[in-house]
Amino acid sequence: MITDAQKTLNLYTKQSKALKNNNLTEYNKLQIEINNLSLKNGQNKKYIDEQNSYIRNVINKGLSFENSPRAQLRSFGIINEILFPLIFSSLFYLIIALLGGVSVSTEFENEGIKLYKTPLFNDKNIILYHFASNVFTLSLCYIIALSFYIVGVGFFNGFGAINYPSGIPSIPLVENGIVDILYLIWGFLVIMFIVSFGILLSVFLRKSLLVIGVFSIIFLGYDLLKNQEFMTSLLKYLPMSYFNPIDILTKDYLSSKYGLIIGVFYISALIIVFLLISIRKYRTLSFRKI
């Protein structure tokens, strides 16, 4: 044990010198040696194996090391650590609902929707018009925001490598490029869901304040209750559980071989159902003829 302790101390000294020389590759190679000594002493095998796999993955790809797996500074890494988790949160879901989920209810309040009862805007077209226009606008804002963030961070810190391991717990070796693309595509799916659900609520409630109130109760209520024990068996049936693709891959209550496929089909099916119900409900409403 004394010999191992001395070896570890010497390795820490070498690591300190490597950091002073800003040689992160050498620092991490030494970390593998330290980890191997720790394994001999019965320390956390799972954590150490994951850390060693991460280090070897970066070295084998010939990449420059980030400061740490989940404290990356370059664009393609930091975006899935900071920006995407912020976008995939209840606060932003409510912002999406406010910007794109209440347009139909606002038209009811302004009585403007009555003027759409023309051959061009029939029962079906008015619902699809609101859906398509809001999804397009929000998607455009989404892409612009991501582009500015990537370019802005890239300008100051560099863009990094898309094949750098993300370091996400449970899936640490999945590359940043894959995580970023998955988040990007899923964002469009979430936008379509929220807009379609907002239209559904609007044709029944007809008041934008009520629509936002329902959204707030659902999203914030989900955040407050999702970690409660009694919710464990229910989470896999709630659409909000499938809003974040990384949660699908890493959370115990969702992770499965086909989790992402199930999520896509489930949310897509709900979008279609919401639109069909909205169109049917709209046809039962009374309008002033032009």
Outline where the language-model segments fall:
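Hydrophobic alpha-helical transmembrane segments
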Residues: 1-86, 203, 266-267, 271-290
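Alpha-helical transmembrane segments of integral membrane proteins, especially early/N-terminal helices
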Residues: 43-64, 106-107, 143, 147-149, ...
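Secretory targeting signals
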Residues: 60-105, 128-199, 203, 246-264
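Short loop-to-helix capping motifs
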Residues: 122, 206-208
